Every structure is written in C-alpha cells, then in structure tokens.
Regions:
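N-terminal secretory signal peptides that target proteins for export/translocation
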Residues: 1-11
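Bacterial N-terminal signal peptides
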Residues: 12-26
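Helix-start (N-cap) segments at beta->loop->alpha junctions
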Residues: 186-191
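Short amphipathic alpha-helical segments
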Residues: 94-103
C-alpha cells in the first residue's frame, strides 16, 4: 500500500514554483537555436575584437568616470523610456568621444549594437547606428551579469531584446588593474 505524501504548507508554494520554472526554462532552451559552425566562428572573431576594444584607454576612462559619478544623475529605466530619439542626453551618449569610437566600431554590420556600461549596468556610451538602447540600466540582464563575470558569449541564437534580430549576445568586461569595472556588450548577427 502506498502512503500519500503530504507537504507542509510552507513547502508547497516553493516546490510548485521550482517545478514551474524548471519546465519554463526547459521550454525556453528548446526554442533557442544552437550555434552553427559559421556563426560560432563569427562570435569568436567578435569576442576577440571586443576584448581589444574594451581595453582602449578612452573606454576604460569613460567607465571609470561613470562609476565615480554613479551614472547619469537621476536616470532610471522609466525616465529613459520617455526620452525621444533626438534628446540631447541621447546625443551626448552617441557623440561623446567614447560614443564616436563605439559608433566607428559598430559600422562593421556583423554586430547589431554596441553598448558600454559601468559596473552598475548604467549606459556610458552607445552607437546611434542601431538606435536607442532599450534600457538605460541592464544590471539584471544576463549579458551584463555574465560579461562582468567573464562569461562572454551566449551559446544559442535568440532574438535580440533591442533589435529583435536573430543574434548571439556577447559581452566582455572592461578591466582596470585586472578588476572588472564595466561591460562592453554587443550582439553578433545570425541573419
């Protein structure tokens, strides 16, 4: 004879949530496309480029300054959403010396965006080629978190959060004296 298993009420919800998120994660992984060798080769090339770009003294200094300031005063994602495409603040991020450098690097159309972020995930500089970044602060997003830790590339193709193009997210840490102080984030086109 089998006994029924009774769980204390304090365990029921956490267990159900665990099962739900396990199934959701598995379903999400099933939808992601694995990397074809040609895409993997492109990702490897651009990871190497991002490492070099992230070490540029202008980039390192811009991130260092943003960390010192704490990002743009009073900026948050809700306020960021309200900014128009021609807002002076957005133009400043694009037309600063580091923004111009990032824009020049993004002219290579294999990458769909290029964003520089400080240690808190705040946008430091961006290219205007791919349009306004969707988030001012992306500290909670995997590309930023993984880039800061040195886990540099996703292993699957998914629609990009900003451009909606099929791509592979890549991010590298911006280092100062061997310590990660920010992230240079891009997406390698898979189209």
């Amino acid at each position: 004879m089998y006994k029924k298993l009774y769980l204390p009420d304090s365990l029921t919800l956490p267990l159900l949530l665990l099962v739900f998120f396990s199934v959701a994660l598995t379903a999400g992984l099933a939808q992601a496309e694995p990397l074809a060798p040609s895409i993997k080769a492109k990702v490897d090339v651009y990871l190497k480029k991002l490492v070099v770009w992230a070490a540029d003294p202008l980039i390192v200094e811009a991130v260092k300054d943003s960390n010192k300031r704490g990002g743009i005063a009073n900026m948050e994602n809700a306020k960021w959403d309200e900014l128009g495409d021609n807002d002076p603040l957005l133009m400043w991020l694009n037309l600063s010396d580091e923004g111009k450098l990032i824009t020049a690097w993004e002219e290579d159309r294999v990458i769909d965006k290029l964003n520089l972020r400080d240690a808190q995930g705040n946008l430091v500089a961006s290219s205007y080629i791919s349009g306004k970044p969707r988030l001012y602060n992306n500290a909670s997003r995997a590309p930023f978190q993984n880039g800061l830790k040195g886990v540099w590339a996703a292993s699957e193709i998914q629609p990009d959060f900003t451009t909606r193009k099929k791509s592979v997210q890549i991010a590298v840490p911006v280092l100062l004296e061997g310590k990660a102080i920010g992230v240079l984030h891009s997406a390698v086109s898979a189209e």
